[in-house]
Design a protein with these regions (language model features):
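Alpha-helix C-terminal capping segments
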Residues: 203-209
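DNA breakage-rejoining catalytic core of tyrosine-based enzymes
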Residues: 200
């Protein structure tokens, strides 16, 4: 165990410094040894690894989660005698519901008439948290494929969307994934609790019902191209920059090359073209908006967006899901990618470093204010 002696102001404890140095050396040796061993295991594992599934679908019944929280709170809050009556009533209702369902199946029809025909509506919840490259597409496409393999127009899909936008092609693909749901005539609700801007709104406007929280950021229907240019810096220091290309507009804006007015005009033309396509996309899917008034690149909060017909309702995703649990079977669907040993090792090391830094920072702060 490392003992930290109490030092008087200005006192230098050589013994403490030596002990602390030895501690760091031992700790560093152990960490390096562990990393080497795990790296060898990882490399060996990768060599012997057989191709298989990239990941798997996980489905969580949200009704159970809400019922569990409700029951826990009931037991703490309600009188015991009253609670017994509540449970008795619920058991009776559940029994009556099962009996009615059984009778409906008997009335009828052949054994092939499965409970599917008399089942409750199913409500599938997906999550999309986008970055500049919309990397969450990798999971979204798998989740949608899984849902479409079982859902039908009686069901509904709710997507909790959070994205400030990003690259046009990436968000175009993400939007196309949502179109798969609409093409199957399955109702699509999109909930925005925080932000759906630019490419995020490109996705959101596809919803049959678009719901936003009061202060969610909505809009930014615009296109931007920006990059720094160091051509003047290179000239100042007599550094040549060579670029060979074929095609008049193969390179219009570059980081190190000199930008010509012709190149600048071409980029502006491309930006205007993409903006026009973006506007047409929004107008096609939300015909009630005044597209020229909202496609200015501006952002509005949820309540302002509703006034401009950019969203349909002001609510949170929690409200939508809780309401759905009253009348439907609600499932949160998530595609989980398998993590390699390298990924797991990286996360462990990152977590360890964060904890060590946090502890050091806390101790430093405590010492400062003692």
């Amino acid at each position: 165990m490392l003992v930290f002696p109490a030092l008087k102001k200005g006192e230098i404890c050589l013994e403490y410094l030596i002990e602390y140095g030895m501690f760091l050396a031992k700790a560093g040796t152990i960490v390096v040894a562990v990393i080497i061993v795990l790296s060898v295991i990882a490399v060996t594992g990768q060599k012997n690894k057989k191709p298989g599934k990239k990941g798997s679908i996980k489905a969580t019944r949200l009704n159970d989660h809400i019922e569990e929280m409700r029951d826990t709170l009931r037991e703490k809050v309600l009188d015991k005698d009253y609670l017994k009556l509540v449970y008795k009533k619920e058991r009776k209702e559940s029994k009556a519901e099962r009996k009615e369902k059984k009778q409906q199946l008997k009335k009828g029809q052949a054994e092939e008439v499965d409970s599917e025909e008399t089942r409750k509506k199913r409500f599938y919840v997906l999550n999309f948290k986008g970055n500049i490259g919309a990397e969450a597409i990798s999971s979204l496409r798998e989740e949608i494929t899984a849902v479409l393999s079982i859902a039908d127009p009686r069901d509904e899909v709710l997507v909790r969307l959070e994205s400030p936008g990003g690259m046009v092609n990436a968000y175009g693909l993400a939007s196309s994934q949502l179109l798969r749901i609409k093409n199957e005539k399955i109702p699509l609700t999109i909930c925005v609790d925080k932000v759906a801007a630019s490419g995020g709104y490109m996705m959101a406007c596809l919803a049959d019902k678009l719901v936003a929280a009061p202060f969610a950021l909505i809009g930014s229907i615009g296109v931007i191209v920006q990059l720094p240019n160091f051509s003047k810096v290179l000239k100042k220091y007599d550094v040549d920059y060579e670029m060979i290309s074929a095609g008049e507009f193969k390179r219009t804006l570059t980081t190190f090359g000199e930008i010509t007015q012709k190149g600048r005009d071409k980029v502006q033309e491309d930006v205007e073209t993409i903006h026009g396509i973006f506007k047409a996309w929004v107008k096609d899917h939300r015909p009630s908006v005044e597209i020229d008034k909202i496609a200015t690149g501006e952002v509005w909060v949820g309540t302002q967006a509703k006034e401009r017909y950019m969203v349909d309702e002001i609510r949170t995703s929690d409200e939508c899901i809780n309401d759905a649990c009253d009348n439907a079977e609600v499932y949160e669907v998530e595609y989980v990618f398998k993590k390699s040993i390298q990924d797991r090792l990286g996360r462990v090391l990152e977590s360890t470093a964060d904890k060590l830094f946090s502890k050091w920072f806390e101790r430093s702060t405590d010492d400062k204010y003692q």
